Amino acid sequence: MASNKVVFSALLLIIVSVLAATATMADHHKDQVVYSLGERCQPGMGYPMYSLPRCRAVVKRQCVGHGAPGGAVDEQLRQDCCRQLAAVDDSWCRCSALNHMVGGIYRELGATDVGHPMAEVFPGCRRGDLERAAASLPAFCNVDIPNGTGGVCYWLGYPRTPRTGH
């Protein structure tokens, strides 16, 4: 009977400790906004509806140059693109903005959002090259993205998944 009281007391102490720690953390983070990507990283909220127009031009030029970093892109255009990407205030939203931009490029060209990576979306530019150029822009621009590896957006690893347009 005494051992049950000890176990019960220990469990009660653990529960009270967890609740106290949770309350302390909630109080500590009360001024910070914590959200999932889906709540904030939407066109018109986390980034503009027509996102990154200068980056669209960079991606198209890189694609025709078959993704060579800096290939066929003049310095002013690169700087403009990098400023636009860095201006997406929430670094968590940068890959979402680039994904939305790629969907916009496809719509502008009359291409579907999904297709084979080797399919051309415009002369000299294959779908896979376009997506690779877009996903690599954070590394190209040296801007922080917490949701990718080596400055490359996470969605590049899923080239055959449907694009949501945001």
Swiss-Prot record:
Keyword Signal set for record: yes
Statement: the UniProt record of this protein carries the keyword Glycoprotein: yes
Keywords noted in UniProt: Allergen, Disulfide bond, Glycoprotein, Secreted, Signal
SUPFAM superfamilies xrefs: Bifunctional inhibitor/lipid-transfer protein/seed storage 2S albumin
Signal peptide stretch: 1-26
Pfam family, one: Tryp_alpha_amyl
Known function: Seed storage protein.
Higher taxonomy: Eukaryota, Viridiplantae, Streptophyta, Embryophyta, Tracheophyta
Xref: PANTHER family: SEED ALLERGENIC PROTEIN RAG1, TRYPSIN/FACTOR XIIA INHIBITOR-RELATED
Subcellular localization(s) per the UniProt record: Secreted
GO cellular component, one term: extracellular region
Protein family per UniProt: Belongs to the cereal trypsin/alpha-amylase inhibitor family.
Gene name for this UniProt entry: RAG2
Protein name stated in the entry: Seed allergenic protein RAG2
Record PTM text: Five disulfide bonds are present.
GO molecular function, one term: IgE binding
Source organism (scientific name): Oryza sativa subsp. japonica
